[in-house]
Regions:
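Extended alpha-helical regions
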Residues: 1, 113-127, 192-203
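Sec-dependent bacterial lipoprotein signal peptides
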Residues: 1-18
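C-terminal/domain-edge helix-coil "capping" segments
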Residues: 18-45, 107-109, 159-203
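A structural "domain/chain start" motif
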Residues: 18-99, 201-203
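Surface-exposed short loop/turn segments
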Residues: 28-31, 111-163, 174
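Soluble periplasmic/extracytoplasmic beta-strand elements of cell-envelope proteins
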Residues: 48-59, 129-133, 150-154, 165, ...
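A structural motif corresponding to the C-terminal end of an alpha-helix
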Residues: 97-115
């Protein structure tokens, strides 16, 4: 019991189960960034990406980072620190995703620079852009205990038109009474799959 309780408490902290902050709704990857739906972008279309490259993140990415931060603060006020599994909290740190995806993209596109939107990409002289979207299906403590991560990368040409979409997917089924959810491993696997497709389709 002494091992199980901290794990369950930390899991609630990380995933906002029960009465924690509600999960942010998943929105279209282009919402408030581009005046069309992302649904029509061809999947796996080969292209040569112009340099230098802009990196833009979707509302889903920003919502994910904000949600984990808010959940951590919320449960930190309720759960005694002695019952908190700090390893799980570290495993779900949203800055890990940001660092890993940026590191991977920089290997392929050294000129990559973060911008807030396409207007800034054009005004700063970027000749191509990558928009990163993140979709997460969180485990259900009493249902499907599988965490699923999808990372979508949309590639835009010099005119800032979307030309190709690539996806990296990974999932992990969390065992009952687990002391960790292996979220960073799941992110790493999704990024690795995405990188393999970048190698195959993007020049």
């Amino acid at each position: 019991m002494t091992r199980t309780l901290p794990a369950l408490v930390a899991l609630a902290l990380a995933l906002s189960a029960c009465t924690g902050p509600p999960l942010p709704p998943q929105v279209d990857a282009f919402q408030n960034l581009y005046n069309r739906s992302s649904a029509g972008v061809p999947s796996g279309a080969p292209m040569t990406l112009g340099q230098p490259v802009a990196l833009i993140t979707s509302e889903n990415v920003e919502s994910y980072i904000g949600h984990v931060k808010n959940s951590t603060e919320y449960w930190g006020k309720i759960v005694p620190s002695t019952l908190t599994n700090t390893a799980i909290i570290a495993d779900t740190d949203p800055t890990y995703f940001s660092h890993q995806i940026l590191t991977m993209l920089k290997r392929h596109f050294p000129t990559l620079q973060y911008v807030r939107d396409f207007r800034e990409a054009v005004s700063s002289g970027k000749k191509g852009a990558i928009l990163i979207d993140l979709r997460i299906k969180y485990m259900e403590p009493y249902g499907d205990r599988t965490n699923k991560v999808d990372i979508d990368a949309y590639f835009f040409d010099t005119a800032m038109n979307p030309v190709s979409k690539l996806n990296g997917h990974a999932e992990y089924k969390v065992p009952y009474a687990a002391m960790e959810v292996k979220f960073q491993r799941t992110i790493d696997e999704a990024i690795a799959e995405l990188e393999g497709k970048i190698n195959a389709y993007i020049r």
